[in-house]
Swiss-Prot record:
Keywords (A to Z) from UniProt: Chloroplast, Plastid, Ribonucleoprotein, Ribosomal protein, RNA-binding, rRNA-binding
InterPro entries: KH_dom-like_a/b, KH_dom_type_2, KH_sf_prok-type, Ribosomal_S3_C_sf, Ribosomal_uS3_bac-typ, Ribosomal_uS3_C
HAMAP family on file: Ribosomal_uS3_B
UniProt keyword annotation of Ribonucleoprotein present: yes
UniProt cross-references to Pfam families, sorted A to Z: Ribosomal_S3_C (PF00189)
Gene transcribed to yield this protein: rps3
Subunit structure, as described in the record: Part of the 30S ribosomal subunit.
Primary subcellular site in the record, as a coarse category: plastid
KH type-2 domain boundaries: 43-118
Cleaved signal peptide residues: none
Organism: Buxus microphylla (Littleleaf boxwood)
Protein known as: Small ribosomal subunit protein uS3c
Family membership noted in the UniProt record: Belongs to the universal ribosomal protein uS3 family.
Length: 218
């Protein structure tokens, strides 16, 4: 069998950047990592609870964390920030206070900024959430995959591959189904590829969704 490497880790330093930007001493490195994870989880939970459309979708493409001695800067890249901010002018402040409560750092200030993504459906996380929503509503998986591909065409990408694994349509035996449109060169390091794997809980069991999006060649 072909061994698949994670396309993001494979391209770190060429077309992919890190989502956490900070230095730490070896002793305190693991604490820093756990702190990052806490911040990300806290933000995702808050967004899930407070989205205007309560579909369980977050619309978060990625969360970047930059740390300095006295400041933690968090940048949330969202596809549809309006759904979170509209009607609640203090939405970002509330979120900031929530995250600050989570970890009690006395001497560090936390700053959260939300950035809107121009083409949300060019982001695999947002697409995966869309497919997950469709599968939960018992839409046929083929229909969901085709609709997702139509959405990426608006974001003028060069290729997309979607894979769904598990008890598809509630069948007894788990299987893997996939669909590809355009080019997805996984072995070309200079090819900019966005990737995500997403777990969705349906009434039949857990399904795994993987999405590769080929954006551009550098």
């Amino acid at each position: 069998m072909g061994q698949k490497i994670n396309p993001l880790g494979f391209r770190l330093g060429t077309t992919q950047g890190h989502h956490s930007l900070w230095f730490a001493q070896p002793k305190s490195y693991s604490e820093g990592l756990q702190e990052d994870q806490k911040i990300r989880d806290c933000i995702k939970n808050y967004v899930q609870k407070n989205m205007r459309i309560s579909s369980g979708a977050e619309g978060i493409a990625r969360i970047e964390i930059q740390k300095r001695i006295d400041l933690i800067q968090v940048i949330i890249y969202m596809g549809f920030p309006k759904l979170l901010i509209e009607g609640r002018p203090r939405g970002v402040e509330e979120l900031q206070i929530n995250v600050q409560k989570e970890f009690n750092s006395v001497n560090r200030k936390l700053n959260i900024a939300i950035t809107r993504i121009a083409k949300p459906y060019g982001q695999p996380n947002i697409l995966a959430e869309f497919i997950a929503g469709q599968l939960k509503n018992r839409v046929s998986f083929r229909k969901a995959m085709k609709k997702a591909i139509e959405l990426t065409e608006q974001a003028d990408t060069k290729g997309i591959q979607i894979q769904i694994a598990g008890r598809i349509d509630g069948k007894e035996i788990a299987r893997v189904e996939w669909i590809r449109e355009g080019r997805v060169p996984l072995q070309t390091i200079r090819a900019k590829i966005y990737y995500c794997s997403y777990t969705v809980r349906t009434i039949y069991g857990v399904l795994g969704i993987k999405i590769w999006i080929f954006v551009d060649e550098e």
